[in-house]
């Protein structure tokens, strides 16, 4: 249960067949944890990177797809999974950079994307590869599923689930083909496309995307862009203590 960071814990929520309830459960869990911690004069945080030299906090989403009879359409009895699984993976990879703002919505979110910390920073997938952005876990083929590993714990669960589902649907409907899976450490693969690795780049990528308009309502897109630009402007106007320590007397 304990994770790499000091005072850090991994919590697995029960799988449910309703994405909205899954997001509700994530919000309720965060509220309960914060309330219990406060009663004991402690602070529980879901910042993506609360401590610069320790592990960040991720929000990994596991997703299966069932047909009307309850059969897992990602499973075809093989170790690799079905064609539909690979189409879904391809859709997630295609939309990943454009949706990074949803997976990493704050300035602090991008401190988590550090090579060597098991937080993905490129567009990649693989079987049992914990350095990839999209991982296909091993185990019983009947439980074949996709693990989306990009989001930080600070992300909005409703927007994350929406982006994951929309990406999978985009790939399935367009029958996109996934590239070859990565079996090595993805940080060492220089040819992989990197995600937007800073907040402003993610905002610009989301705003200029030719895919986002087909995934989300225009009102939501416009509002999110406006809010994030306003938030980014406020942070840009702040002078940090590190700047004072570095420059105040030395320039």
Task: Describe the role of every protein-language-model region.
Residues 14-18, 211:
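A broad detector of the eukaryotic-type serine/threonine protein kinase catalytic domain
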Residues 3-11:
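Short, conserved phosphate-binding/catalytic loop or strand-edge motifs used
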Residues 186-251:
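Acidic, glycine-enriched catalytic cores built around paired aspartates
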Residues 6-7, 53-54, 222-223:
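Short secondary-structure capping/turn micro-motifs that flank functional sites
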Residues 1-4, 103-108, 216-222:
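Short coil/turn segments at secondary-structure boundaries
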Residues 19-182, 187-192:
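Active-site capping/gating regions of soluble enzymes
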Residues 2-3, 15, 60-62:
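Histidine-centered active-site/metal-ligand motif
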């Amino acid at each position: 249960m304990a994770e790499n960071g000091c005072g850090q814990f991994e919590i697995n929520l029960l799988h449910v067949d309703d994405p909205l309830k899954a997001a509700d459960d994530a919000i309720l869990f965060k509220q309960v944890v914060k309330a219990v911690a406060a009663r004991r004069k402690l602070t529980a945080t879901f910042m993506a990177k609360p401590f610069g030299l320790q592990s960040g906090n991720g929000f990994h989403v596991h997703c299966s797809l069932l047909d009307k009879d309850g059969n897992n359409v990602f499973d075809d009895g093989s170790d690799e999974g079905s064609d539909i699984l690979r189409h879904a993976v391809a859709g997630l990879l295609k939309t990943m950079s454009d949706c990074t703002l949803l997976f990493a919505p704050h300035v602090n979110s991008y401190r988590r994307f550090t090579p060597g910390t098991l937080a993905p920073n490129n567009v990649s997938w693989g079987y049992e590869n914990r350095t990839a952005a999209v991982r296909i876990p091993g185990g019983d083929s009947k439980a074949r599923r996709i693990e989306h590993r990009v989001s930080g714990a600070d992300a909005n669960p409703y927007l994350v689930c929406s982006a994951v589902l929309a990406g999978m649907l985009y790939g399935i409907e367009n029958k996109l083909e996934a590239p070859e899976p990565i079996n090595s450490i993805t940080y060492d693969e220089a040819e992989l496309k990197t995600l937007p690795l800073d907040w402003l780049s993610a905002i610009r990528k989301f705003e200029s995307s030719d895919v986002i308009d087909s995934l989300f309502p225009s009102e939501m897109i416009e509002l999110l862009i406006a809010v994030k630009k306003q938030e980014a402007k406020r942070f840009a106007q702040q002078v940090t203590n590190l700047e004072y320590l570095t420059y105040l007397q030395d320039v």
